[in-house]
Structure formats: structure tokens, C-alpha cells
Amino acid sequence: MWDFDMWIFPVILLTDPIVAREMLTYRTRIIRRAVQSNAASNNIGGWQYPWASAFTGREVTSTPGAAELQHHITADIAFAIRLYLYATDNLSWMVTDGCELAFNTARFWMRRAVYNSATDKYDIPTVTGPDTMNPNVLNNVFTNVMAAHNLFLGEYAGCVCESFINLKNEDLNEMIRTARGLRLLHESNGDFNPQFEGYVVGRQIAQADAVLLAYPLDLEMEQSTKRNNLNIYGPVTSASSSAMTWSMHTIGWLELDELTLAADNLRRSYQPYLRSPFNVWNQGPVEFPGAPNYVSGAASFLHTMINGYGGIRLRDGEMVIRPRLPPGTTRLSIPTINFNRFRFSLEVQQDGSFTIRQQAIPTMPTIQIIIDGVSHEPCGINTACAFHGINSATLKLVGANANCQLKPTELNIRLADQNHAVVTSCTYGDRSVADPKLPIEYNR
């Protein structure tokens, strides 16, 4: 599931959100009983997703360690829900499907987090992050940040589906306090994020882990920290690492405007992984062959083109676009991108300028288009038009639900330093949705 939710799903979401929604149905409806059973078998509340599953949702992985320790998979799936909300603002779907998953996976992390009186924060012990070379660690930074993302989304679900979830504000307060209290390791001497408690610089890792905090997790951090993470973890990553590692390093260097380093990592992200005669992706480089037809590697290359050189970021209430041309090319064309019923293509020209072409659609998009600081309205129903820019564009959602707001993810705050009144009374607002009477209960 990690491969699907983190690498494949985000690409499909931008190109065809209807198909993306159908893919989420497997996680929200089909395997509901199995994920409840998985958590109960580990004496943990909420929903716990398997590392790998088939039709039943039961664990089918051939790697027991993944099932036992790589619990970030549960938060990875909730992260896919977060991205779907960013891209579609589909609150009706949230009520019928998403709330139950978002809230019950957050409940899982409420039980998984352990209070540490010495730090007045929460730890997540005995986990393995994406880096499987260093298993069973304390406070893996990727896992902790993903868990915090999940907890904030769970609190948001409690607001959106307030009338269907029998909760008090104190319950949602506790969810937010746990999220903000999760440890986020940062070493001031060196200004970087240790991958886990006790990590020593120079220790080898299997694949990108702490580097993922910048993208795709989009955690707010200092540029210097982002740079140091790339410099520290790049040289110690195993030569047998999958293509996704170097795709994420490419995007990281692009965020820092280090175009030469980005180009080096771009070549490293695909050239060793393609197999002739049809350039099929392999899980490993030539000297370390792995699974053939490795779709996750191909998907990560699309991340590099769409989110890296295309510069696209999905965030709460907006899509940010900061495009640039890939090295050795004269044009970058992404034929279809969707954001809240606004369908468009993106083309980057040789001089670095770009064009957003709105495609004719039967409904009026509820967005504002800001290009190089100038605001534009989308063209009318069933009408195509183009917008030109030089530096960046932002598509902003108009008329978002003001009654429920997804709070920004923040961690590493002592409980004593947190404001206890973090949740306000919220209602669903004026939007009309069906009442599915979701069977959600809360027990820490």
C-alpha cells in the first residue's frame, strides 16, 4: 500500500480525480472490518492498515517486519485522503467515506503515541520508517510527521462530521495536543533532522526517509535544514536504493534552486533503472536488479516532472505552480491537471515562461487564478482560454468551508506550552450532504 498511496495515487489524483476517488473506496469501504481487526489484534484502537493486502484486507506481505513495525502505512493512507481533499474539496465524499477513515486512523495514533514525562512530549516507539535498513527505532521522523498529519486530519474529520460523530471538544482537543506534542527530532549542531533517536551521521540507510519531510510531506522547515538533510543522507544511501529516493532528492534540490544538483539526481533517478529494449522500469539499478515493471519507480519519475520541474504543490485551499524546464529539453508539457473542477494543461517554454490553458468544462470552477501576482478569473462554461506567466501561479479555492478548517501540521511542542483551547465549536455549514449515520466511536 505504501507504493500506491505515496507514489502512484498522487499522480492519478491530478490527472483523473474520479478514478482516484474510486481507488480510495478500497480503503474506505471494502476492507473496513479487516483494518479494525488488525488494530484490535495488536491491542490498539482505531484502524490499522496492513502493509500489503488483497481483496479481504488481511495482511499478505511476505515480509513480517513490515507488518509488525512499518506502521506509517496507516498514516500514508490518511495522507492520500488529505491530498484528495486538497485537490477536490469534496466534503460530501468526506462525510460518506473519508471521515470514518480519517478519524479512526487518527485514533490508532492516539494509542500508538506514548507520553514521555521527561520531555513532556509524545514518543512513537518500536517502528520502522521507509528506511528498512534501520528497523525498530524510536521516533522515526517520517513516521512521527505522518502521524501528526493523520491526527490533524482526524480532528478536521471530527468537525466536518460533527453531527455524525458523538464527540466532545475535549476529545478533539486531545487529538490536537497529541499531534503537536509528538517529537520531531532536530539536531541544532548541524541543523538537520536525525532520522531516528540515536542516529549517527554517516550511518548507511536504505532509501530516502528524513528527506521526505520536505516533499511529499510538505512540512514547513528552514531552507538550511532541508539542504543539510539532502547533504547528509544522500551520500549514505545504499547503492541498491530504488528510483524513488533520487526522484525525491531531485525535487528537494529544485526547491532550493540548485539546478545542477537537481539535474544530477534526475539522471540518477531513471537512467540506471530502465531496462532495454522497451525501457521498462526495474526496482533496482542495473547492478542490483529487483522486481521488473516497477510501477512505483515510474510514478516517482512523474512526480519529478509534475511536482519537481512542473513545480506543482497541492495545499489546503490552493494549488501552487512554480515551473521550470528540465535540463536538456526545449519544452515541458503536462496535458491534463485537475484542481477543484478546473481542468488545464501546463506548458513550460524554452525561455522559462509558462502557459496555463483552461480546458472547456461544463461547470464554472470556483477558483481564483493568480499569475505573477495578478489575479484572473477563469473563463466561462464550455470555454477554453489561456493564461501566461513568467515566475509562478497560484490557484485559490473560492468559498471554502469556513466552519471547519484543517489546521497546519506542527510538532515538537511541550504539553505545558500548548494552549488547551485548541478546538472551537464547529458546524458543517450551509453545504447540503446526506446523513450516512457513520458508526464512529471514540475510545483512547
Roles of regions detected by a PLM:
Residues 35-50, 113-128, 186-194, 242-244, ...:
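Glycine- and aromatic-rich loop/turn segments at beta-sheet edges
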Residues 104, 108-167:
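Acidic/histidine-rich catalytic neighborhood
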Residues 1-114, 143-144, 151-154, 158, ...:
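Aromatic-rich carbohydrate-recognition surfaces in CAZymes
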Residues 2-30, 79, 83, 87, ...:
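Active-site core of glycosidic bond-cleaving carbohydrate-active enzymes
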Residues 260-443:
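Non-catalytic C-terminal accessory modules of carbohydrate-active enzymes
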Residues 22-26, 93-103, 121-127, 264-268, ...:
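Beta-strand segments within the central parallel beta-sheet cores of soluble alpha/beta enzyme folds
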Residues 51-69, 124-139, 276-290:
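Acidic/His metal-coordination segments adjacent to aromatic residues that form catalytic metal sites
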